[in-house]
Amino acid sequence: KGIDTDSFIAVTDTKYEGFVPGEIKTAAVPADMVEGINIMDNSTVTLVLYDKDVNGNHKDFAHVVGDFNNWTLSNDEKSQMYRDDASGCWWITLAGLDAGKEYAFQYYVGTKEGEVIHLADAYTEKILDPDNDKDISASTYNENLVYPKGGVGIVSTFKIQKDSYNWKYNDFKIANPEQLVIYELHLRDFTATSDINGAMGKLSYLKEMGVNAIELMPVQEFDGNDSWGYNPC
């Protein structure tokens, strides 16, 4: 009986072809920029990422991906960052942004050997956390963005036109600061309702104990929703 010879067909998958970073583009960081998120005007933001170890080494490439470029890596002005060896930073200026929109983004940095890291901006004021955000109830905070499909781990955010807050008392001053009796208060664990309204209902209790000042703990993002915020992030 006969046996047919094997035949092979070469297929190229262009849709899922691996991204190849371009050659490093060098340029000085624009004047007056600081590390992190720099708001330039109502439609422009400059991102600056420090990357230099104790030996002066740095990664071979750095890109940014986010809502502003549909989480797409590319070797153009929408994704590839410039390198400035004098400052030890990568940077990119993003234009054509919506001042009232909150954007999620990450840095994509790595080496020619294949090491890749997805980073949130260390100076962001708000993060998206795929592991812990689901445990934050709407009654606690209902303005979180939906975690992006293109994100990996912690994702940073920015908004050009930040929401303003109108203070009810603009002339408040602490009388006799040397006489303060400060109570460190964590809203979640202080009352059964775990919110500021519950704490306000207990002000008379604190006053009876001689407390005349409250320090809310904490007021910033911290690691782990069940923590009190003392552990470092």
Question: What name fits each language-model region?
Answer:
Residues 47-102, 110-134:
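Aromatic-rich carbohydrate-binding modules that target alpha-glucans
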Residues 105, 109, 114-169:
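Core domains of carbohydrate- and sulfate-ester-processing enzymes
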